[in-house]
């Protein structure tokens, strides 16, 4: 006999020539074989599972499960054909089997959770029930197509879920009131904030425009200074080369003159030697002139940089003060005037402190730049004088007017004095003229200690015709 199953059915064939069970949609049924038709359509099972939480509080879990054979797995179909298909899908046997699995897994899971955990994590609780029930149904070849677990229900006499619902409703209502009040507050504050930000942005754009204009002017001035500095450095290099050539020529002339006058008398040798010394002094003056030009260039550049940095710092301070004043003016109009005034005052003081710190930093950078320029000037001067520290010190003292100041102080000390030296002598065994000369000689002997004091203070030696320093140590 030839049998054909419907679209939602399968043929389960057993008997002769078949080891276990053969599932087919259509087949010939031979003598000695048995054929059973079973339906694959899912069936809805409705339950009200009574469970108890970890605190021994009972509750009811209404649920509707749509369960049927797993059609995409041959092994599951074989299990279903063996275990379930002999019974009617709507029979008490199948219904009690499914209900027992669902109730057992639900009660075990609920017993491990508190009522609060069940209520707060309803979705997670339902998912865990679904997973555990499906795990048990797999051994029967069944699949949960859909599981609709309804809202948890109180057991009569226990009002736990209703009280939790009322609590949640009250919390939601209170939170809604808070949200409405907060939204109104944010709206009013946001309106004021937008007006303040508009004024701030306008002031900021104006300030940035002025800063950019000043930066462009400063860059142009810097380029001009750079070009003039390079030209000046080139001129100084050429002058140094000319001075070096003149020095070489003078040295050669001095050498030739000295060679030509070797046979001359000692007096002529002294004259030639003196001429060479004078030529050296001329070269030193040329080097001093070059150094003075370099000093002027470096100091002027450092001064320009210092003034530029100071102006930038002053403008930054002015901009920050105006922004702080705008913020303070807007904050005074808000509902919380005292708090806004304190915040804006703190912000203004902070910005003023930062601006003052920035100005101090720029001023310090200018001082450092000026110090570096002066150091370069002294280093160049020392190199030009052949690392002669004494000559550099004398030049700096002359250039700084120290000798003029010393002379002025000494002149002030003796101003108005009319020294008169009267020498009295009784004649004695010698004539009066000889005694007077002895006194004058005594005054002259006081000059070497005086010269020594001047030498210690200024480093200068007296002319040979005036005397020499005293060798005694006092």
From Swiss-Prot:
Membrane topology: Lipid-anchor
Tissues expressing the protein: Expressed in all plant organs. Primarily expressed in vascular tissues. No change in spatial expression in root upon inoculation. Expression limited to the nodule vascular tissue.
InterPro entries linked: Band_7, Band_7/SPFH_dom_sf, Flotillin_fam
Gene3D superfamilies in UniProt: Band 7 domain
Induction notes from the record: Not induced during nodulation.
Keyword terms: Cell membrane, Coiled coil, Lipoprotein, Membrane, Nodulation, Palmitate
Covalent lipid adducts (S-palmitoyl cysteine), residues: 35
Principal subcellular localisation of the protein: membrane
CDD domains with a match to the protein in the record: SPFH_flotillin (cd03399)
One Pfam assignment: Band_7
Keyword Cell membrane belongs to the record: yes
Cellular compartment(s): Cell membrane; Membrane, Caveola
Disulfide bond positions: none
Keyword hit for Ribosomal protein: no
Record note on modification: May be palmitoylated.
GO annotation (BP), single: root development
Cellular component, GO, one term: caveola
Family label: Belongs to the band 7/mec-2 family. Flotillin subfamily.
PANTHER family per UniProt: FLOTILLIN-LIKE PROTEIN 1-RELATED, FLOTILLIN-RELATED
Primary role: May act as a scaffolding protein within caveolar membranes, functionally participating in formation of caveolae or caveolae-like vesicles. May be involved in nodule formation.
Protein known as: Flotillin-like protein 3
Organism in which the protein naturally occurs: Medicago truncatula
Gene this protein is translated from: FLOT3
């Amino acid at each position: 006999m030839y049998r054909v199953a419907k679209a939602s059915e399968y043929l389960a064939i057993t008997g002769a020539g078949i080891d276990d069970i053969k599932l087919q949609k259509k087949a010939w049924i031979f003598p000695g074989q048995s054929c059973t038709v079973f339906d694959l359509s899912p069936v809805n099972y409705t339950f009200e599972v009574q469970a108890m939480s970890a605190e021994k509080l009972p509750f009811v879990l209404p649920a509707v499960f749509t369960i049927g054979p797993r059609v995409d797995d041959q092994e599951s179909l074989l299990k279903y054909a063996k275990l379930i298909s002999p019974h009617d899908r709507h029979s008490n046997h199948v219904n009690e089997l499914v209900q027992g699995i669902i109730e057992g897994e639900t009660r075990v899971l609920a017993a491990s959770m508190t009522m609060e955990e069940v209520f707060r994590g309803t979705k997670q609780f339902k998912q865990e029930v679904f997973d555990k029930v499906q795990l048990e149904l797999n051994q029967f070849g069944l699949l949960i197509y859909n599981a609709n677990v309804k809202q948890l229900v109180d057991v009569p006499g226990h009002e736990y879920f209703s009280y939790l619902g009322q609590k949640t409703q009250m919390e939601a209502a209170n939170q809604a009131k808070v949200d409405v009040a907060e939204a109104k507050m944010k709206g009013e504050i946001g309106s004021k904030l937008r007006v303040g930000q508009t004024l701030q942005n306008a002031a900021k754009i104006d300030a940035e425009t002025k800063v950019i204009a000043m930066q462009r002017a400063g860059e142009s001035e810097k380029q001009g200074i750079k070009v003039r500095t390079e030209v000046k450095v080139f001129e100084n290099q050429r002058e140094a080369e000319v001075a070096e050539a003149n020095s070489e020529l003078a040295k050669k002339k001095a050498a030739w003159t000295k060679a030509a006058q070797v046979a001359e008398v000692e007096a002529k040798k002294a004259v030639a030697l003196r001429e060479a010394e004078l030529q050296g002094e001329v070269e030193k003056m040329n080097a001093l002139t070059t150094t003075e030009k370099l000093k002027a260039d470096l100091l002027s550049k450092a001064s320009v940089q210092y003034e530029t940095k100071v102006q930038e710092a002053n403008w930054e301070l002015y901009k920050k003060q105006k922004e702080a004043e705008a913020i303070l003016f807007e904050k005074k109009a808000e509902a919380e005037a005292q708090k806004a005034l304190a915040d804006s005052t703190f912000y203004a003081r902070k910005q003023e402190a930062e601006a003052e710190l920035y100005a101090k930093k720029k001023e310090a950078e200018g001082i450092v730049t000026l110090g570096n320029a002066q150091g370069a000037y002294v280093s160049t001067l020392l190199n030009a004088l052949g690392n002669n520290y004494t000559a550099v010190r004398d030049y700096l003292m002359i250039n700084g007017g120290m000798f003029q100041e010393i002379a002025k102080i000494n002149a002030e000390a003796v101003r108005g004095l009319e020294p008169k030296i009267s020498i009295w002598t009784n004649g004695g065994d010698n004539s009066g003229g000889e005694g007077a000369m002895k006194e004058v000689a005594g005054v002259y002997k006081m000059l070497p200690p005086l010269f020594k004091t001047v030498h210690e203070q200024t480093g200068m030696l007296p002319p040979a015709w005036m005397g020499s320093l005293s060798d005694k140590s006092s």
